[in-house]
Curated annotation (Swiss-Prot):
PANTHER family: FORMATE DEHYDROGENASE (PTHR30592), SULFUR CARRIER PROTEIN FDHD (PTHR30592:SF1). Belongs to the FdhD family. This is Sulfur carrier protein FdhD. Mo-bis(molybdopterin guanine dinucleotide) binds at residues 246-251. It comes from the Archaea. GO terms for cellular component: cytoplasm. The active site is at 105 (cysteine persulfide intermediate). Disulfide bonds: none annotated. It comes from Picrophilus torridus (strain ATCC 700027 / DSM 9790 / JCM 10055 / NBRC 100828 / KAW 2/3). InterPro entries: Cytidine_deaminase-like, FdhD.
Length: 262
């Protein structure tokens, strides 16, 4: 399935024009777990249909439902169904969550926000630093690699960089939290389970769910082009993550642990 399709539109300005416009596809994805020959339907996620295996992997790990080293295989059983076979999983956590996730909300189904803090792998220990000029250059680097955005102008992105500003992984999705799950999921599928000396750059704002997912992967710096939320700042403070927002060409705001930025 293509991540974008053409739709008819009408432009109204000085003259009425009929055009064909590219729009980002939003479709449901069923995510399942297979364990001991039994299938568990975990979640239906509204997403853009690209990198589905990475999305399912990142979602399940970032939600604390599975541990990355327990994954046996990830398979796409149909166009809108991905199944992750695992040695074991967190059955209690699965029972305590209503897993319908729309493309704009990654935390909507959680019955207790405190549960999100419980499943983290601990605070980030890395004290490695990077120069502010590297942070300022990340949004443009990410934008140049946003292939779907160049066609539709309506899709989020998330990218992992090393502390020298080299891109490691990038993903796009109509949901910003999905883009993060995809980006982290790609690394997990390469058997990389934690990256403390890394920067997560996201389009849009830095909400709670973005910081929660970053903490699960051990990311030390999160950078966003728009505003943070109060709870995102709280998570960053708690897990020793440097949170930077309003990143522009010559300025940025640092909301937590500024000592990592030179």
């Amino acid at each position: 399935m293509m991540p974008y399709i053409s739709k008819n539109a009408v432009i109204i300005g000085r003259d009425r024009k009929f055009i064909t416009d590219n729009v980002t596809v939003e479709e449901p994805l069923q995510i399942s777990i297979e364990n001991e020959n039994r299938i568990y339907n975990v979640s239906v996620i509204m997403r853009t249909p690209v990198d589905d295996e990475a999305l399912a992997t990142g979602f399940l790990v970032n939600e604390g439902i599975i541990e990355p080293d327990k994954i046996i295989k990830v398979s796409k059983r149909s166009e809108n169904n991905v199944c992750v076979s695992v040695e074991s999983f967190n059955e209690d956590l699965l029972k305590n969550r209503n897993f319908y996730v729309n493309s704009s909300c990654g935390v909507c189904g959680k019955t207790d926000i405190e549960n999100v803090f419980i499943k983290s792998h601990g605070i980030v220990r890395s004290q490695s630093r990077t120069d502010h000029s590297i942070i300022l250059g990340l949004p443009d680097k990410m934008m140049k690699n946003q292939k779907i955005f160049s066609y539709t102008g309506g899709i989020h992105a998330a990218a992992l960089f090393d502390l020298n500003g080299n891109m490691i992984s990038i993903s796009e999705d109509i949901g910003r939290h999905n883009a993060v799950d995809k980006t982290i999921g790609k690394m997990i599928l390469k058997n990389v389970y934690r990256m403390e000396d890394s920067i997560l750059q996201v389009s849009g704002r830095a909400g709670f769910e973005i910081l929660q997912k970053a903490s699960m992967f051990g990311v030390s710096i999160v950078s966003s082009v728009s505003a943070p939320s109060s709870l995102a700042i709280d998570v960053a403070e708690t897990f020793n993550i440097t949170l930077i927002s309003f990143v522009r060409k010559n300025r940025m705001n640092i909301y937590s642990h500024p000592e990592r930025i030179l």
